[in-house]
Amino acid sequence: MGQKTNPNGLRLGIIRSWESKWYANEKDVPALINEDYNIRKYLNKVYKKAGVSQIEIERLKGKAKDRIKVTLYTAKPGIVIGRDGETRNKAVSELEYLTKKEIVFNVVEVKRPEKVAELVAQNMAEQLENRASFRRVQKIAIQRALKSGAKGVKTLVSGRLGGAEMARSEGYSEGRVPLHTLRADVDYATAEAHTTYGVLGIKVWVFHGEVLPGQTILDTRKPFEASAPRPQRRNRKEANNYVNAKKN
């Protein structure tokens, strides 16, 4: 039976870039990877309710000591920054204590969280933990993503669905999600919902479009422009009058 690979890792170096961008001597690599892991673990824990979709880490050479540039993508920048930057400054202080290096902390707002796979998966997990129907949660998530400009969406929820004795998987799909096309910008994320019946696994695939030569992922993820409003439908009386007038 064929297994699906992670679409994010499959496209690294082709249309996607790495979330950790730095070079180091071979002996220093394990320590730096562990440092990146601790930074992400801390930020995801502190900003659990802030809708964090991605954390990018770059390492820069400074005059006195090395600097780490952390870019956090979030749907709720107000929660990350806090009043007068209080929450952000506290996070910077904690990270500098953790790494013993200077931290440059940037916050980027995610304009359309409805079509970002990581945020869709997090939102689905939150609803499932609040005892929402797994079918309804998936259908609403797909509709919102398509309305926001996604070309295709696929979801899968696994576990003791509805409290059933036997675990199973159930998913929904709408639009195109070409997993074998390497130029296809497919965003993929997973999440866990901790319910009274056990843990439910959530997988989300979102197709944004194809990255053609000379383009980048940013071109396929431009803000979606709403289409022109649909004409209003006439009521039955107006429609009958219109038909009679045409006949006469």
From Swiss-Prot:
Locate the KH type-2 domain: which residues?
A: 39-111
InterPro entries named among the record's database cross-references: KH_dom, KH_dom-like_a/b, KH_dom_type_2, KH_sf_prok-type, Ribosomal_S3_C_sf, Ribosomal_uS3_bac-typ, Ribosomal_uS3_C, Ribosomal_uS3_CS
Name this polypeptide is given: Small ribosomal subunit protein uS3
State the organism of origin.
Answer: Alteracholeplasma palmae (strain ATCC 49389 / J233) (Acholeplasma palmae)
Pfam families on file: KH_2, Ribosomal_S3_C
Q: Write one Gene Ontology MF term.
A: mRNA binding
Q: Which keywords label this protein? A: Ribonucleoprotein, Ribosomal protein, RNA-binding, rRNA-binding
* Gene that this sequence comes from: rpsC
Q: Which family does it belong to?
A: Belongs to the universal ribosomal protein uS3 family.
Q: How does it assemble?
A: Part of the 30S ribosomal subunit. Forms a tight complex with proteins S10 and S14.
Q: Which Gene3D superfamilies match?
A: 3.30.300.20, Ribosomal protein S3, C-terminal domain (3.30.1140.32)
Q: Which domain of life is it from?
A: Bacteria
| Entry's Gene Ontology BP terms | translation
What does the UniProt record say this protein does? Binds the lower part of the 30S subunit head. Binds mRNA in the 70S ribosome, positioning it for translation.
Q: Which residues form the signal peptide?
A: none
Among the entry's GO cellular component annotations, what is one? cytosolic small ribosomal subunit
Q: Where is this region: Disordered?
A: 222-248
